[in-house]
């Protein structure tokens, strides 16, 4: 993709001959986040390797791999049996307790036991942050963030695209942070200016303000004066191939994700700065530099998707330069199979 100027002097993306020869599509970015077909639950290996985590009254709320169930039974058998009823015939893992606080206490004990004794690497990244599983718009159980993948729940976050638009040239530049080399996940990859998980009991906008100060050292007044809610993206994060995956390892986890998306238009004199050690640096990327980084897979996958969302909404990615435009836009808003926050 090459950035050129339109007859009105605006920046536009033009598809090149090289793009056509390589068959390039921004759909590749979607595939890195969610390659699952609509009928993924009908695949034989999915039916064999996946169990549904359910509420005490049978509402499905998560995907749990059989090997993860085996690990929990091995590491914390007593807590597991007190927490869940395992139905092998229906492939269901059902909470036993009808009480919110009791469920939270049990799942917290289970998570801590897994952290100390499990062989699963993901649970070692303890965050001391709870994610809520929502049913009927209310929190059903609170889960330590580090075991969200084990239980296959829907998680939520906020992602903000920060940009500067030159009033004369109309050229856009993006504030792009590079993740810290010490980050537990995706170290040194490119990110959105501000992003963070929706930890309980923080609200969505409350998280926007909290993360803005923590990650970019941006004051509340800057955010309130310049932020704009622009929608959401939703997907089932999965890195395998549904046709061959055996669902017998951590990289086979399926986690539903909802990202609430915001635009933050900043003036040239407002400069984000690393504040909490999670960001190495902030840099201004031109539109061409951003496109190049997307193509080179330098962005964290879901951050790349949020950037693509911006490029679609602002008219840079269009039906004229993206051969899979309709599929891309549709797949960025997957209808998730479990109850959601809103």
From Swiss-Prot:
Gene3D superfamilies: Nucleoside Triphosphate Pyrophosphohydrolase. GO terms for molecular function: 8-oxo-dGDP phosphatase activity. CDD domains: NUDIX_Tnr3_like. InterPro entries: DUF4743, NUDIX_hydrolase-like_dom_sf, NUDIX_hydrolase_dom. Residues 155-309 form the Nudix hydrolase domain. Pfam families: DUF4743. PROSITE patterns: NUDIX. Present with 217 molecules/cell in log phase SD medium. PANTHER family: THIAMIN PYROPHOSPHOKINASE, THIAMIN PYROPHOSPHOKINASE 1. This is Uncharacterized protein YJR142W. It comes from Saccharomyces cerevisiae (strain ATCC 204508 / S288c).
